[in-house]
Amino acid sequence: MLKEPSVRLREAIIEGNLLIVKRLLRRNPDLLTNIDSENGWSSLHYASYHGRYLICVYLIQLGHDKHELIKTFKGNTCVHLALMKGHEQTLHLLLQQFPRFINHRGENGRAPIHIACMNDYYQCLSLLIGVGADLWVMDTNGDTPLHVCLEYGSISCMKMLLNEGEVSLDDNVRDKGNWKPIDVAQTFEVGNIYSKVLKEVKKKGPPLGAGKKPSSFRTPILNAKATFEDGPSPVLSMNSPYSLYSNNSPLPVLPRRISTHTTSGNGGNRRSSITNPVFNPRKPTLSTDSFSSSSNSSSRLRVNSINVKTPVGVSPKKELVSESVRHSATPTSPHNNIALINRYLLPNKSNDNVRGDSQTATINDDGGGGNGGDATIGMGLRKDPDDENENKYKIKVNNGEPRRRVSLLNIPISKLRNSNNTRAED
């Protein structure tokens, strides 16, 4: 048999099922508070006690406890119930929404700070101190939070209260039974720890800002301190929202000759520009293409500034051809043949018109007519017709003039007629 919506809503809050809670409250908006008849707990009380943070947010958005203060039958609020289990995140949310509950007294006249000291929840105590909780508030027996710490053996909360300075200024406060805090210590060990910590605190003196309470809902900002003492750190301590940069850093200074901006190179690659040239070897790749390159290539030949000497006894033509063949058949690497080719190809830096025509290593021979038997090499080499030795060539550089292409349109018509007549006679 299906249970009542109020019971299902209460069970969904305890289990932390936010979807069912939304569905039930959407269908039954009058069940927002849903007071339990056994203990007087509302929906927000159950969510706070079990630490259901998201459900607390949803209930507060719907207006839970907006117009009236809802207490349990024992007089506890949602802040008291959240502190009973030490739910720090839920406590922070409730203190933001209900700041009037900070010093509100519940069961046996205990304030939320008493509940934190009873269970030694020092994280929650630190949050209460930061928002301005009263450190001298008394319950129905006249016990202060320090009395409660020694009575229940909460060492961490006791040290935190003594280090606040305000409590250590007057440690002889008495309750209604005329008992001092040391008199209600749970064990002798707890009493000895209390005496030792109190002596150390009094020896150091009260800390800066002792006796002053925060005037608003803000965590007090302590002195900024870097996490790493040797130098600046991108990670700061929890209590230091701001940190100054330290000049005593052991890290080396970035060299000024290296610019950190990037420039786009050929082919879309991005590289950092460095003042001094640095050679980066490329991965060896076998080139199966000929020495001639396409005229549509975006890269241009540049003159190599390295002075290369031609070996004695070797003609420039043979050296050039052999080096070019070896360059095209072997893995590409920065060696002297590139400097030699650049030296013979482009001695003039301003010559930008020389493209694929000047890079072709083929010999164009006109065959003995027209040009007087001169054989022109595409790279600026001219063959001497008077010398039959192939090892002797004269180097002639094209000074910015593009090489003339050989075409049938360039041959005079008279030569064509003479050749036809000669064939007819034969």
Curated annotation (Swiss-Prot):
Membrane topology classification: Peripheral membrane protein
Its domain of life reads Eukaryota
| Subcellular location(s) per record | Cell membrane; Vacuole membrane
Where are stretches of biased composition, namely Polar residues?
Answer: 260-278, 350-359
A biological process (GO) of this protein is: regulation of cell growth
Mark the ANK repeats by their residue spans.
4-33, 39-68, 74-104, 108-137, 141-171
Q: Which GO terms describe its cellular component?
A: cytoplasm; cytosol; nucleus; plasma membrane; TORC2 complex; vacuolar membrane
Q: Which UniProt keywords apply?
A: ANK repeat, Cell membrane, Membrane, Phosphoprotein, Repeat, Vacuole
What residue spans carry the Low complexity bias annotation?
Answer: 285-302
Task: Name positions with the PTM Phosphoserine.
Answer: S315, S350
The segments labelled Disordered in the record are 259-302, 350-392
> From start to end residue, where is composition biased (Gly residues)?
366-375
Basic and acidic residues: which segments have biased composition?
Answer: 381-392
What does this chain do? Component of TORC2, which regulates cell cycle-dependent polarization of the actin-cytoskeleton and cell wall integrity. TORC2 controls polarity of the actin cytoskeleton, which is required for orienting the secretory pathway toward discrete growth sites, via the RHO1/PKC1/MAPK cell integrity pathway.
Additional remarks: Present with 1180 molecules/cell in log phase SD medium.
Quote the subunit structure annotation: The target of rapamycin complex 2 (TORC2) is composed of at least AVO1, AVO2, BIT61, LST8, TOR2 and TSC11. TORC2 forms a homodimer. Contrary to TORC1, TORC2 does not bind to and is not sensitive to FKBP-rapamycin. AVO2 is peripherally associated to AVO1 and TSC11.
* Protein name per the record: Target of rapamycin complex 2 subunit AVO2
- Its gene is AVO2
